[in-house]
Each structure stands twice: as C-alpha cells, then as structure tokens.
C-alpha cells in the first residue's frame, strides 16, 4: 500500500512541477506588470515614449502636412474653376456682341455727329490751334472747313453751348488773307459771319474761332475746344 502511494507521488510530481512552473510564470508576468490583453497598449506606449526614430516622426508630420495642403487646394479650386468658367462665358458673349455691333453700318464713328453728309467731332478738351489741327489729322480728319450757311449755323449754335472753339481758318501766310486748311480762300459770302469789328489782328491774331454768335480772330497759341470734320461713310441699303 505504501509502495502504491509512493508510486503515485512519483507519477504526480512531473505534473506538479509543470503546474508550479506555469503558476510561477503567471506570477512572474504579473510581477512585471504585463497582461495578456495589454499588447497594443504597450506598443502605443513605446511610440509615445519616442522609441520611434525622430526622422520617422518628422516624415509622418510632413506627409500629413502635404495631404492637408492637397485637400485645401482641391477645396478652393472648385469655386475658382466656376469663376473662370463664368468669366469665359461673359467674355464669349461680349465678343459675339462686339462682332454684331461691328457689322452694323454707321455713317459716322460712335462719338461723332452726322450732319449733311459729313461727320463732326466736338472735343471735350482744349488745345492750341496747331495741336488741334494735329489731333484732327491723327483721326483722318481736319479742322472744320465751312461750306454752307446751314453748316455754319449748325456749328455756331453747337459751339455756343460748349465755349470758344477753333475752326480751320487762318491768315498765317499773309495778314488779312484768310484761307481754310484745305487751301481754299475765304469767300466774300462768309465774311458776314465775323463779329463786329473782327478780324482786327490785335496782337498777332492769326487763327479764327467760333465765339458767341460769330467769328473772332485770336492768338493761335491760346487753348480752345476744336471741331474735326470728315466725310461720312455710305452704308449699303438693306
């Protein structure tokens, strides 16, 4: 009977040692503070305590920054693209409108006035007679040359509302011999339009102007409004 017990003890000893070893291992693990379900937390803790190299952390932050910039660019690019499309549509509409306007036939440019087959430009600035003549030449016209009584009345009334205005009449070549800028002389039929006592050539007054209800001679260096004149354009009949 004692031999059986002794044999039983011998048979149980390896199992007891295994249990003791297992128990000791568990206690040892607990003693070091590890738990079977705490692996992820421990790994995260390692990252937090700077076990990841600093270069990798910087790289991670750089990648995040780049991604943020890309997202912001895409967000702001959408309204910008819509605005560009709207501007393009407006530009195309204006281009089509301009093409339609250009096809319209006008006897005179937009800022000119038509009268009896001629176009007249009434300046809003003031220049000397020579500068006024140059301004007219630059637009393919000349300082106004009066050809009829109707034209004279039209120009006199228009100038009266605006102020003293140059015409294309001078006597620079020979005193008291007045001629137009197209080379034609002043005829006797137009002498009646001089104001009373004019022209008097008071102080080298060699250029004519519209003044109030008649003509006046004055210094060519004075600054006045001016009138340009050119032939109107013939439009084809529709």
Swiss-Prot record:
Keywords attached to this entry: Calcium, Disulfide bond, Endocytosis, Glycoprotein, Lectin, Mannose-binding, Membrane, Metal-binding, Receptor, Signal-anchor, Transmembrane, Transmembrane helix
Q: Which InterPro entries match?
A: C-type_lectin-like, C-type_lectin-like/link_sf, C-type_lectin_CS, C-type_Lectin_Receptor_IMM, CD209-like_CTLD, CTDL_fold
Q: What is this protein called?
A: CD209 antigen-like protein A
Coiled-coil region(s) at which residues? none
Q: What is the lineage of its organism?
A: Eukaryota, Metazoa, Chordata, Craniata, Vertebrata
Q: Which organism is it from?
A: Mus musculus (Mouse)
> Where does the chain bind Ca(2+)?
198, 200, 202, 205, 216-217
Task: Classify the source by domain of life.
Answer: Eukaryota
Q: How does it sit in the membrane?
A: Single-pass type II membrane protein
Q: In which tissues is it expressed?
A: Predominantly expressed in dendritic cells. Detected at very low levels in lung, spleen, lymph nodes and bone marrow.
Known role: Probable pathogen-recognition receptor. May mediate the endocytosis of pathogens which are subsequently degraded in lysosomal compartments. May recognize in a calcium-dependent manner high mannose N-linked oligosaccharides in a variety of pathogen antigens.
> Where does the record say this protein resides?
Membrane
Identify the residue ranges that face the Extracellular compartment according to the record: 73-238
Glycosylation site positions: 130, 216
- Domain (C-type lectin) spans 115-229
Question: Got a GO cellular component term for this one?
Answer: cell surface
